[in-house]
Regions:
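Hydrophobic ligand-binding cavity/cleft-lining segments
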Residues: 2-12, 16-133, 230-235
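Beta-strand/loop substructures that line and gate deep hydrophobic ligand-binding cavities in soluble
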Residues: 5-22, 54-55, 159-219, 223-227
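Intrinsic-disorder/low-complexity, polar/charged segments enriched in Ser/Thr/Lys/Arg/Asp/Glu/Gln
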Residues: 69-75, 151, 172, 184-188
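Short, surface-exposed coil-to-beta transition loops
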Residues: 71-73, 137-139, 168-174
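A short, structured loop/turn motif at beta-sheet edges
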Residues: 79-83, 144-151, 176-186, 226-234
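Short, well-structured alpha-helical interface segments that form or flank functional binding sites
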Residues: 80, 84-87, 138, 172, ...
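Beta-strand residues in well-ordered beta-sheet regions across diverse protein folds
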Residues: 86, 155, 188-190
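Acidic, glycine-rich loop-and-strand cores that form catalytic or ligand-binding grooves
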Residues: 124, 129-157, 161, 166
């Protein structure tokens, strides 16, 4: 496990207060609309931005869960080279560059995150087995697979998961960068969660609610990474 500070270094550029507030208001509006419409809109938003080939492909991180799982695939085109996108993506995590999503909403639910808008050299190296923190009071999530410049997959394989973890469904959460040409790339987010028909009603409700919230936060994360990479690549 990597040693990680829970506060970013003093020399980095943080997200402006104005942008944080503006995006926070946007996030509240998006969250309300998505939650109210999720029974209908889920069909289209579950795989937001992904094409059929991306939805139907088998990705490396899929191997971190049992074969009986459900998938979510989301994607976005980015007008920047893959290496530029990677330099932002690899900084993901609490105490690092943040989650690139709605900082105000994250703070409202008790996550004191700081979203960073600059490349920090000390955050550019990760390895399989390193853990990324999502909340200062929660265990980190391990990196199960990683290929520098191409993908990072969070989760543990069924073979290495400990007995205590077996009581909860296995899950993998992965991001892939595919170059389209020298100046454009595609960022793909893939989530797999083990599913059982024996899930209780409360577990199914929690999964349903969690799916809506995941969409709200993940679409903003993808859009923020696009903005940062395109701004960086234009310099």
């Amino acid at each position: 496990m990597s040693n990680q500070r829970l506060e970013p270094p003093d020399h980095i550029r943080r997200r402006s207060i104005l942008r944080c507030l503006f995006e926070g208001v946007e996030g509240l509006g998006v969250a309300v609309c998505v939650l109210l419409s999720w029974p209908v809109s889920r069909k289209w938003l579950k795989d937001w931005g992904a094409i059929q080939a991306e939805r139907e492909s088998t990705w490396p991180g899929d191997s971190l869960v049992d074969s009986n799982h459900k998938t979510v695939t989301r994607a976005i085109d980015i007008g920047a080279p893959a290496e530029v996108v990677w330099s932002w993506l690899v900084q993901f995590g609490f105490g690092r560059a943040g989650f690139y999503s709605y900082e105000l909403l994250e703070r409202l639910v008790g996550i004191p995150v700081v979203n960073v808008e600059s490349i920090v050299p000390e955050w550019q190296l990760l390895s399989v087995g390193d853990e990324i923190v999502l909340h200062p009071k929660s265990p980190g999530i391990p990196i199960g697979l990683l290929k520098s410049g191409e993908y990072i997959c969070f989760g543990e394989s069924p073979e290495t998961r400990d007995a205590a973890s077996e009581e909860t469904p296995g899950r993998s959460w992965s991001m892939y960068i595919e170059p389209k040409n020298a100046s454009k790339s595609r960022l793909i987010l893939r989530s797999c969660i083990e599913y059982s028909e024996e899930m209780s009603s409360s577990e199914k409700l929690a999964s349903w609610f969690g799916g809506a919230i995941d969409f709200v936060m993940e679409q903003r994360m993808l859009r923020t990474l696009k903005r940062l990479a395109e701004s960086d690549g234009a310099h």
